[in-house]
Structures are given as C-alpha cells and as structure tokens.
Amino acid sequence: MWTLKSSLVLLLCLTCSYAFMFSSLRQKTSEPQGKVQYGEHFRIRQNLPEHTQGWLGSKWLWLLFVVVPFVILQCQRDSEKNKEQSPPGLRGGQLHSPLKKKRNASPNKDCAFNTLMELEVELMKFVSKVRNLKRAMATGSGSNLRLRKSEMPADPYHVTICEIWGEESSS
C-alpha cells in the first residue's frame, strides 16, 4: 500500500515540477498589457495590476501541495516501521508465531487474511466434491448412468476449469 502512495506522490511531484519549470516558457499574449481588442480598435482596461496571478498560478501553493502529503506519508511510514519493531525486552519467546504477530498489527489485514483462509477452505471443499463426482462417474459405482467412451474422464483426480463450469473442451 505504501508503494501505491509513494508512486502517487512521485507522480504529483513530477507534474508540479513540470508545471513549475515550464510555466515561465509559456507564450506571452501578443496584445499590449491592459489593452483588449474591441472591434477595429483597442479598449483599455482600467486598474489592471502588473502581475495578475490566481491561486492556480502560485508556485508556492503547488509546492505546498506536494510537500505536505509527502511529509504525511513519510511520518506514517516511520510510525508503521516503529510499530513493527518492538523493543527486545518486550519480545516474546519462541512460543509466539511470527504470523500471529503480523496479524495483530492491522485489523484490515486480519480481516483480509481470515477471508482468504475461508475462501481457500471453501475452494478445497468444492474441488474435493468435483473430484468425488468425477471419480464416481469414471468408475460407474453407485449409479445406473453409463457414459460413452468420449465422455469418460481421462484422470478422475485432475479437474479442469471447463469441467467445473460445465463447458465442453474444444479439442
């Protein structure tokens, strides 16, 4: 996750530095300062300041937009590193597994880990059921259904995605 944040900050820095460096190279307007073409003659604008700059044109504001998120990300990364490293006096013995230490670090990671474990268990149960059905079809035990030679599975333990989804193979 921190690599994603760092890459976003890097892209933001590159974009802002590009805008900062090349903003002075933009073409200046060809009309004189304070004059606007109005028909065939020029109309003079009143009270036009020398340098009109909006908040988007402020280089310091863009620099602030880049530096503040970068500092925040660095502080978060340092705090995460400090959480992972515990002092030697507080470390447990060899009884605690390193997996359990990592799981206690973040509740989001813990939830994702538990979800993945449940999905893995469900997938193993499903594949086991498919293998049992395939083996039963191959041996013909317990069923009156007789399969043709072309429908007989070559390996009752090998399960393909096409067989799970019920699609016929093109070969």
Curated annotation (Swiss-Prot):
Residues 74-171 are cytoplasmic. The keyword Transferase does not apply. InterPro entries: FAM209 (IPR027943). Residues 114-139 form a coiled coil. Residues 20-52 are extracellular. It is found in: Nucleus inner membrane. This is Protein FAM209A. It comes from Homo sapiens.
